[in-house]
Regions:
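Extended alpha-helical targeting/anchoring segments
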Residues: 1-505
């Protein structure tokens, strides 16, 4: 096993007190991200897998596995807390002295590492989610609604092992960050890093010992229930339309939460979801007491090399059964005045969000009103970019765009007040973000859509519809049901696979 950097170069940086990474690479043509997760993470909590599928068909270049964090940061009830001994005392969280966003900014700064050019930006950093209700730390909003699920408002982990799959080079790079400690010599730190890498390489080299999850006999169909009846949701839509008619808002996104039993391991749902609903942002995050499985189509905010990007998706049609039908649906979507007006409203909101942190006159709409195709649907998409002003950082950019207008409404703050009034329960994870702050302090995040939260044998899926002046309440109710279907279809697929394993097929 060849390790980079060499021990002497490592020791020099260590002596200067610089954080750095140690890494090794191997050929990956016989390994997949899924098999690697089963080998190296198994059932260990505080691990994750991030993947990507572009256009519903082409795998993205990088897939990322992270595990064994040295720290976990979270926000509970508006207060930040951190566990710096996660590997030895997983329940030992201490409150942070600063307000949550200030504490997070300090953690991002603390976690910066200068990576070599041969490694991608996500080879080290902090990874996780910020739930929708983190916006209460950014805007003045009423107290949240009741929270029957009870997960933290945010969780971010800093893995000591990151496994990077490069689909272009057919290579796996295993990376372990090292941060100098006064009580540990450079030789000892390097030896421990080598041991961590060796353990992962040994696990990857071993045959897959995983047995498919099995399911006890029972129905395979998943029948979800909602926290909102159809009649209640239709009344919510009618109330929102009254606010629109009164001039309070132009649009608001109203959601409901569906749930159904799910007794299989959460990773079984992820494996099914990546097959039935591939998307640009595929993610599996295991936090021990709960797991997150998602296939989001939409960027929230990206900050890369000084450029801030927001890509609003608004306006939807199903994919056609034939190329001609697909093209006809595209033409119909682009000609739909209601869809175009809604998209333009959210494009303007995205431009304003970027403008809050971008240099003067740098905000540009680089593409607008083009169609992006996914496995099941197509959307109208636009792309907004701006150059990050030097007085702001990636966290400022995230706060400027949080939550996305496509899951809240316009004007955003008034729309969120109406969401609090009309929705019955705290949103929690839904409409927040999943992503990472890289070792360079950059950001890649997506909106939490088409996502299941699995806790205590139950999967929760939240979906919403954008309400405008001419919305039909029954149609908006059906849109929520349709958007949630992909996750429950994946659950049925996972159950079918497990049932076949039980029968020995």
């Amino acid at each position: 096993m060849q390790i980079e950097p060499q021990a002497t170069a490592f020791a020099k940086r260590y002596a200067r007190g610089e954080a750095q990474v140690v890494w090794t690479s191997l050929v990956s043509d016989l390994e997949t991200p899924v098999s690697a997760v089963l080998k190296v993470a198994g059932a260990r909590p505080m691990s994750f897998l991030l993947e990507s599928v572009e256009g519903g068909a082409v795998r993205g270049r990088y897939s990322i596995i992270g595990l064994d964090p040295d720290l976990v940061w979270r926000t509970v009830a508006g207060r930040a807390e951190i566990n710096r001994g996660m590997r030895h005392q997983p329940d030992s969280f201490a409150p942070c002295n600063e307000a949550p966003l200030a504490a997070l900014r300090a953690l991002i700064a603390e976690s910066r590492i200068e990576l070599p050019d041969v490694l991608p930006p996500m080879a080290a950093g902090i990874f996780g989610y910020l739930g929708y209700d983190m916006v209460r730390l950014m805007e003045e909003l009423p107290r949240p609604n009741p929270d029957p699920i009870g997960i933290p408002d945010a969780v971010l982990v800093r893995p000591t092992i990151v496994v990077v799959f490069d689909a272009v080079k057919d290579a796996i790079t295993v990376v372990t960050p090292v941060r100098p400690q006064n009580s540990i010599t450079a030789d000892t730190a390097f030896a421990r890093a080598r041991e961590r890498l060796s353990a992962i390489i040994d696990a990857l080299d071993a045959p897959l010992a995983h047995s498919p999850p099995t399911l006890q006999a029972g129905p395979l169909t998943v029948w979800p229930s909602s926290n909102t009846t159809p009649a209640e949701y239709e009344r919510m839509v009618s109330a929102a339309k009254e606010y629109i008619a009164a001039g309070d808002i132009f649009q608001v996104v109203l959601s409901q939460r569906f749930e159904a039993p799910f007794e299989l391991p959460p990773f079984a749902l992820y494996r099914a979801l990546r097959r039935v609903n591939p998307a640009p942002f595929l993610y599996f995050l295991d936090f021990g007491g709960f797991s997150i499985v998602g296939s989001s189509p939409e960027i929230l905010v990206r900050v890369r090399e000084g450029t801030v990007t927001i890509r609003p998706l608004a306006g939807t049609r199903p994919r056609g059964a034939t190329p001609n039908q697909d093209k006809a649906l595209e033409t119909e979507l682009l000609a739909d005045e209601k869809e175009r007006a809604e998209h333009l409203m959210l494009l303007d909101l995205g431009r304003n969000d970027v403008g809050r942190v971008a240099r003067t006159a740098s905000v540009k709409v680089t593409d607008q009103f083009f169609i992006e195709r996914f496995s099941q649907v197509m959307h109208i998409v636009s792309n907004v970019e701006g150059q990050l002003d030097g007085k702001y950082d990636a966290l400022d950019a995230l706060a400027a765009g949080f939550p996305a207008g496509t899951v809240s409404g316009a004007p955003k703050v008034r729309a969120m007040e109406i969401i609090d009034e009309l929705e019955q329960e705290k949103r929690g994870l839904y409409a927040g973000s999943v992503g990472y702050f890289s070792a360079a302090g950059e950001l890649d995040s997506c909106i939490v859509l088409r996502t299941a939260l699995i806790k205590d044998g139950v999967m929760y899926v939240q979906a919403g519809a954008g309400i405008v002046a001419d919305s039909n309440p029954k149609s908006e109710q059906q849109e929520c049901v349709d958007k949630a279907k992909a996750l429950f279809r994946a659950a049925e697929e996972a159950k079918r696979f497990a049932s076949a394993a039980r029968r020995g097929q």
